Swiss-Prot record:
One of its GO terms (biological process) is riboflavin biosynthetic process. It comes from Geobacter metallireducens (strain ATCC 53774 / DSM 7210 / GS-15). It is an enzyme of class 2 (transferase). GO terms for molecular function: 6,7-dimethyl-8-ribityllumazine synthase activity. It comes from the Bacteria. Its EC number is 2.5.1.78. InterPro entries: LS, LS/RS, LS/RS_sf. Pathway: Cofactor biosynthesis; riboflavin biosynthesis; riboflavin from 2-hydroxy-3-oxobutyl phosphate and 5-amino-6-(D-ribitylamino)uracil: step 1/2. This is 6,7-dimethyl-8-ribityllumazine synthase. (2S)-2-hydroxy-3-oxobutyl phosphate binds at S86, T87, R128.
């Protein structure tokens, strides 16, 4: 019979770093509210949550790496919004942010969850930041909690 390893949604005693891009701040702040709600609902103490605001999404991966390298965080949650415009800038930023965040997690071994919206329109971003399509900040925080707990089962 195989052993199934699953993470409990219990943030009690865990320390989280959250990074929020200020560009498209209306969206970023809704994502942050969702992430904080998920963490506190699942037992996190607000005093164990650090929030770093950075200029935009492009700065998120390096900030996540610096946070992870401190060894102070059980998980890092990355939040922001990259919304398509009329130039190829969106494609470059969206690709680099997603690759960069994944690289930080693989390089450091610290769970880094991706709650950076990459949408075609502002309406899609609003939907994913707490209206019709739920709150992806909440989802990213839940992912962070569960991943930490799965990793703890490997010990």
């Amino acid at each position: 019979m195989p052993r199934f390893i699953e993470g409990k949604l219990d943030a009690t005693g865990l320390k989280f770093g959250i990074i929020v891009g200020r560009f498209n701040s209306f969206i970023g702040e809704r994502l942050l509210e969702g992430a904080l709600d998920a963490l506190v609902r699942n037992g996190a103490d607000e005093a164990t949550i650090d929030v770093a605001r950075v200029p935009g999404a492009f700065e998120i991966p390096l900030t996540a790496k610096k946070m992870a390298q401190t060894g102070s965080y059980d998980a890092i949650i990355c939040l922001g919004a990259v919304i398509r415009g009329s130039t190829p800038h969106f494609d470059y930023v969206a690709a680099e942010v997603s690759k960069g965040v994944a690289h930080v997690s693989l390089e450091t071994g610290v769970p880094v969850s991706f709650g950076v919206l990459t949408t075609d329109t502002i309406e899609q971003a609003v939907e994913r930041a707490g209206t019709k399509a739920g709150n992806k900040g909440f989802d990213a925080a839940m992912t962070a909690i569960e991943t930490v707990r799965v990793f703890r089962e490997f010990r």
